[in-house]
C-alpha cells in the first residue's frame, strides 16, 4: 500500500519547475539542519536553485561541528533578499514560532511539533505530524518512499537530527523514529558522527572548566 504522505510528496515534487528558486528557512538546530539538507536533496535537479537559510546565530559547539563536518550550506537569512526567490519552504518549525518568519508566504511546511489552536499553518504542501520524535524521521521516510538513497553526509545529518531531538530515545521517539535511525546507520559516516558527538561533551564540560579555573584562582589568592 502506498504511503499517502509519500504520494503527496511525489505529486508535489512533480510540480517543481526549472524556473523556480527556493529558499528553505529554519531555526537552526540539528533536526532543522538535517531536514533542510534532505529537502534540498529531494528538490535537486528539479528547480533552478535551493538555498538554506537560518534565522538564528549558531553558537553551540555541536551545531557548529555538524555544519562544518557535514558541509551544510546554511546562511544567515537577510529579509531584503526575499525578492531573489520565487518560493519558500520551512522545515522543523511553523510560521508563528518566530517573528522572523512573519510576512513570508510559505509553499511548503514540514514539522513534527504540535499544532497550536488558532495558529494552523497554511501552505500548498503542509505536513505536520506531532507523532514523530523528529522532523528528520519524516524526511527519512520521504527519501525511502521516493527511493532516494542518501549519501554519507546526509545520512549522518539525519541520524544526528533524530538523536538530538529524541535525546537518543530517552525523551521521545517511537517505532518510526527507531526504524529510520536503524536504516540511516547503514549509510552514515560513523567517524564524522563521533566527531560531532564529541563536541557535545565539550559544550557540557565548559561550565565545569570555568568553575575549576575560578577555584584555582581563589586558591592562589
PLM region descriptions:
Residues 6, 47-50, 55-58, 91, ...:
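Extended aliphatic helical segments
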Amino acid at each position: 500500500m502506498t504511503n499517502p504522505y509519500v504520494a503527496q510528496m511525489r505529486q508535489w515534487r512533480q510540480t517543481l519547475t526549472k524556473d523556480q528558486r527556493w529558499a528553505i528557512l529554519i531555526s537552526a538546530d540539528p533536526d532543522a539542519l538535517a531536514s533542510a539538507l534532505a529537502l534540498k536533496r529531494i528538490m535537486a535537479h528539479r528547480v533552478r536553485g535551493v538555498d538554506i537559510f537560518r534565522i538564528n546565530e549558531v553558537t553551540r559547539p555541536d551545531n557548529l561541528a555538524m555544519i562544518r563536518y557535514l558541509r551544510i550550506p546554511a546562511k544567515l537569512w537577510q529579509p531584503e533578499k526575499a525578492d531573489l526567490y520565487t518560493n519558500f519552504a520551512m522545515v522543523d518549525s511553523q510560521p508563528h514560532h518566530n517573528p522572523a518568519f512573519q510576512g513570508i508566504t510559505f509553499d511548503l511546511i514540514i514539522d513534527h511539533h504540535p499544532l497550536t489552536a488558532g495558529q494552523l499553518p497554511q501552505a500548498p504542501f503542509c505536513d505536520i505530524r506531532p507523532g514523530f520524535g523528529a522532523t528528520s524521521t519524516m524526511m527519512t521516510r520521504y527519501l525511502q518512499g521516493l527511493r532516494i538513497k542518501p549519501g554519507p553526509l546526509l545520512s549522518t545529518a539525519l541520524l544526528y537530527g533524530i538523536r538530538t531531538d529524541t535525546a537518543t530515545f530517552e525523551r521521545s521517539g517511537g517505532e518510526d523514529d527507531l526504524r529510520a535511525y536503524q536504516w540511516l546507520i547503514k549509510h552514515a559516516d560513523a567517524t564524522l558522527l563521533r566527531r560531532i558527538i564529541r563536541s557535545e561533551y565539550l559544550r557540557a564540560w565548559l561550565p565545569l572548566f570555568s568553575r575549576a579555573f575560578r577555584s584555582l584562582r581563589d586558591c592562589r589568592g
